[in-house]
UniProtKB/Swiss-Prot annotation:
The gene is apaH. This is Bis(5'-nucleosyl)-tetraphosphatase, symmetrical. The lineage of its organism: Bacteria, Pseudomonadati, Pseudomonadota, Gammaproteobacteria, Vibrionales. InterPro entries: ApaH, Calcineurin-like_PHP_ApaH, Metallo-depent_PP-like. It is an enzyme of class 3 (hydrolase). The keyword Nucleotide-binding does not apply. Hydrolyzes diadenosine 5',5'''-P1,P4-tetraphosphate to yield ADP. It comes from the Bacteria. Pfam families: Metallophos.
Length: 273
């Protein structure tokens, strides 16, 4: 049995299938862990949802910002973004089944054997693994309750940007969602920056003083697990300091990256979509 982690798919199903062919993936004995954002700008978002769902227990996926946006669009809360290719999902005969399945996916998944946690964007620098897990479970419980539409209606804001354990209600939920699905840079005091998407090396000298990748923040809570995440395509992959970034911009014409945790080997597939 082998365990593979793969970066954001975003509807680039053909590249994912080629990666799985590279390693002779067998869903009867192997596992595929996906860092979220199954859908969005690639050509096969509908087919990607169907494929990952069909893997059943051979796949573990988590929610990314594009997945949550898809759910919001399904309820008329938001509109399909100009470059997204997700319209076919809403007219598919299995649309409701797929969207319900997606809504029941977690924000954080733990691989106990390999001491790994997987989230879409990372772990808030104020959280240890226990707090992160508790926060993820809070949001997951709302998403499967009758308050899930209310949650999606109120998630589209950047505040609060600093974690406090006494946050309550939608402010608490919004921070948790932003940290798990949108975070890239933080300010030195730990506040989340929700605007900058550049790679760290391209920041101006002034910005480098005030914008720090969440995983490089000196005051970051020590973590007991390796963190595997996607989301930040501009990093073009990263492994250091107890974190592994796997989104390498396939949907932007770069390539898709998969990591076999058992032996630390990486596999890549150039974008063809």
């Amino acid at each position: 049995m082998a365990t593979y982690f793969v970066g954001d798919i975003q509807g680039c199903l053909d590249e994912l299938l080629l990666l799985l062919d590279q390693v002779s993936f067998d869903k009867e004995k192997d596992q595929l862990w996906l860092t979220g954002d199954l859908v969005a700008r690639g050509p096969k978002s509908l087919e990607t949802l169907r494929f990952v769902k069909s893997l059943d227990k051979a796949a573990v996926t988590i929610l990314g910002n594009h997945d949550l946006h898809l759910l919001a669009v399904s309820q008329g809360i938001s509109r399909i973004k100009e470059k997204d290719k997700t319209a076919s999902i809403f007219t598919a005969p299995d649309s409701e089944e797929l969207l319900t399945w997606l809504r029941h996916q977690p924000l954080l998944a733990t691989h106990a054997q390999h001491n790994i946690v997987m989230t879409h964007a990372g772990i808030s620098p104020q959280w240890n693994i226990e707090t992160a897990t508790e926060c993820a479970r809070e949001i997951e419980s709302v998403l499967v309750s009758d308050k899930w539409v209310w949650l999606l209606e109120n998630m589209y804001e950047n505040q609060p940007d600093l974690w406090q354990s006494d946050l309550t209600g939608i402010n608490r939920y919004r921070y948790i969602i932003n940290a798990f699905t949108r975070m890239r840079f933080c300010y030195p005091d730990g506040r989340l920056d929700m605007e900058c998407k550049q790679p760290p090396q391209e920041l101006s000298s002034d910005d480098k003083e005030k914008l720090i990748p969440w995983f490089d923040l000196k005051s970051r809570c020590p973590l007991s697990h390796t963190v595997i995440f996607g989301h930040w395509a501009a990093l073009m992959g990263y492994e250091n300091n107890g974190v592994i970034a796997l989104d390498t911009g396939c949907v932007w014409g770069e390539y898709m990256t998969m990591y076999r945790v058992d032996d630390g080997q990486y596999f890549t597939q150039k974008a063809i979509s």
